[in-house]
Amino acid sequence: MGIMGPRGPPGASGAPGPQGFQGQTGPAGARGPPGPPGKAGEDGHPGKPGRPGERGVVGPQGARGFPGTPGIPGFKGIRGHNGIDGIKGQPGAPGVKGTPGQAGARGIPGERGRVGAPGPAGARGSDGSVGPVGPAGPIGSAGPPGFPGAPGPKGEIGPVGNPGPAGPAGPRGEVGIPGISGPVGPKGAAGIPGVAGAPGIPGPRGIPGPAGAAGATGARGIVGEPGPAGSKGESGNKGEPGSVGAQGPPGPSGEEGKRTGPAGPPGIRGSPGSRGIPGADGRAGVMGPAGSRGASGPAGVRPGEPGIMGPRGFPGSPGNVGPAGKGIPGIDGRPGPVGPAGARGEPGNIGFPGPKGDKGHAGIAGARGAPGPDGNGEQGPAGPPGFQGIPGPAGTAGEAGKPGERGIPGEFGIPGPAGPRGERGPPGESGAAGPAGPIGSRGPSGPPGPDGNKGEPGVIGAPGTAGPSGPSGIPGERGAAGIPGGKGEKGETGIRGEIGNPGRDGARGAPGAVGAPGPAGANGDRGEAGPAGPAGPAGPRGSPGERGEVGPAGPNGFAGPAGAAGQPGAKGERGAKGPKGENGPVGPTGPVGSAGPSGPNGPPGPAGGRTGFPGAAGRTGPPGPSGITGPPGPPGAAGKEGVRGPRGDQGPVGRAGFAGEKGPSGEPGGTPGPQGIIGAPGIIGIPGSRGERGIPGVAGSIGEPGPIGIAGPPGARGPPGAVGAPGVNGAPGETGRDGNPGNDGPPGRHKGERGYPGNAGPVGAVGAPGPHGPVGPTGKHGNRGEPGPVGSVGPVGAVGPRGPSGPQGIRGDKGEPGDKGPRGIPGIKGHNGIQGIPGIAGQHGDQGAPGSVGPAGPRGPAGPTGPVGKDGRSGQPGTVGPAGVRGSQGSQGPAGPPGPPGPPGPPGPS
């Protein structure tokens, strides 16, 4: 069995893809205008308030961007054939590990769940505006009790306004290109490490050099996902024994090199990565649960005429985009469909030359294999791997070759565990406003809200006479904004929208400077041989071998009796393999030669090379220079709570309905009549006590002003209705125009409680990053986080922009050719078989089995990498989500003091 070649050096790790962008948040839908007030109903018994509109289901969180495509695994070196007496071929240099694909862009968040249309407002009888107090009239005799009036018709619901244009979403801060992890050392400033140099050419024997001293630690790069393990190649057929070459003198020992290249100074922050393809919109949310029915409202008055619909309000200006909140990580959405591949980017600039590499020591020749049997035998099991040679000093990096063309992308590998979550960067600047998306469709009606608590009935005053209409009152002060509401349950994932076009290429960053090399480390201990691997599967049938020559004719035997022609016998089993011959003597060690000039970098070796055992860790190098503090990184992924949008301005106050005419006074204490239909909202009544601060809902878009109702004749003040339970505050709408001033009502008896302080105003656009502060002391390395769960294989992301080329290595001197290995001992010739008794001349034997395929030649050099495709254009903004949840009406204030008793009313209808 041949000597197993040393393992080749490991392939270079691909740089992790940049983090995908977070998709734009869909704008909130506009709040629909309130319907016109319905006709006021006659004095009836308190009707139950209308069910509040459902609360819209919160849209699903945007789908998470596609994970970066795992890098193409390095080619596995070709395993040497088990040629009898043949020296096992050197393993090829490992293939360069492909750079991981660019991380998929974070998908655009799905549409916000459609807001349920508010339930029809119960036609609440409007409270008549209180006229000026007249002089107390004489107490009249009570008239006959009137029957309850017929319930008024239900007021029509005004059409839901179209949502206003969405505020432009600022683009995300551009993502910098992550650097490759530098060697371990004191942690320098958070600079981007330089790119890794091209892998050096394996030495003559491929013996890995000892580990060099670790340089100063640069900023910790993002950990790329490991590529999948390459599949094990099929074992080749057993080759015919080759002739053993003559033993040559061993090559000279090379100078001790360094396993790791010099640590470069922290690189300048690279150009921002291109914008990823936005993900699809989420699916529409599900309808929320039905609320319970509200408590009975106050008594309605006689139905009035339907109000005239007011003019449509102008949409307000969209609020500024607030800063990104530091929320908890969001739940990963389903990956969107694969976006189109971006255009190829421009090739990067060639980096600065690297230091010259030293030549490694020549490896010790392996023992000669034992002779094998003659003929083409079946392939035996693979022997145990040979001992690793004494590691010679690693050669310094040679001249970096020009980038080859981009190879065909390999198959997707199984994604490795997720790396630790990086620190959240500062928020990026607000970008230019994008075009407004189309208006979302109206969502379905939601279930009714819960019943409000029924308040205590107010004191019923004596019916007063209808006074003349008072002058219009001045608008009341705006109540304090409610406290933020709790986060609603997460809705189902919305329908995924279309994928936008790819983004444009970012600018290319300048290459980093080359750092000084660290000291060389000591040689590591020689590793022990590993256990023998399992026998590989049988290889393909080889090509026919050369036809053997006819041997000399044997002596004529005695003619035997002619036997009957028998049937061809079964093929006998193949004999056992002969014993392995002893290893030949090891040739003398040649003199140590002087280090020859390092040769240029050769093409990548064939796939299948084994990686040599790592050398011992070198001494820690001196601390590297502090890196240049890079600009603020891109903002981190949105948390679970999401970024709170800007607080919308308060929606317009709709014109209050007009007061209905005063109906006939009923006898106090009469039996309650049937439940009346809730009347339309009345005009603005007496300012009640200030309600408690409600929970602000989701910020709605600009609402449209409600229709201006026609002011009707003032009606008598009805009995105060029961105070309903505080409704769920909806999202504050945009600030609308001031409504018409209402009539001045009498002051309330109780002063309302002071409301909670209002929410902060809209957050302005994020300013430009400030100047860089002084570099702080070097922090300690944090613990590496536990690997995250293995994510599902995402679709192929768009090809990212080409990173800056690595430093151009100095071309090394060509090394001297190594000495030829010792010639193996010729195999023992097999014995001639014993001549059998001559019989009848047999038939010609079958042609011998084809000879085994010779050892595969080295893999050709990889083609030059083609230019990286440019990213496509930025995708169109997603569709505008439906309107936000309409907030329910606040709780009614306490009733004012009863008016003076009026004269008795006429008898009611029978």
From Swiss-Prot:
Organs and tissues of expression: Forms the fibrils of tendon, ligaments and bones. In bones, the fibrils are mineralized with calcium hydroxyapatite.
Basic and acidic residues compositional bias, start-end: 40-54, 571-580, 811-822
Annotated stretches, region: Disordered: 1-184, 200-910
Source taxon at top rank: Eukaryota
Description of post-translational modifications: Prolines at the third position of the tripeptide repeating unit (G-X-Y) are hydroxylated in some or all of the chains.
Subcellular location: Secreted; Secreted, Extracellular space; Secreted, Extracellular space, Extracellular matrix
Assigned GO CC terms: collagen trimer; extracellular matrix; extracellular space
Sorted UniProt keywords: Calcium, Collagen, Extracellular matrix, Hydroxylation, Repeat, Secreted
Residue ranges, compositional bias (Low complexity): 10-31, 115-144, 169-184, 208-223, 266-280, 289-300, 362-371, 427-444, 460-475, 501-523, 550-570, 583-598, 674-743, 756-769, 786-807
Biased segments, Pro residues type: 895-910
Stated role: Type I collagen is a member of group I collagen (fibrillar forming collagen).
Complex formation: Trimers of one alpha 2(I) and two alpha 1(I) chains. Interacts (via C-terminus) with TMEM131 (via PapD-L domain); the interaction is direct and is involved in assembly and TRAPPIII ER-to-Golgi transport complex-dependent secretion of collagen.
Family recorded in the similarity comment: Belongs to the fibrillar collagen family.
Stated name of the protein: Collagen alpha-2(I) chain
Origin species: Tapirus terrestris
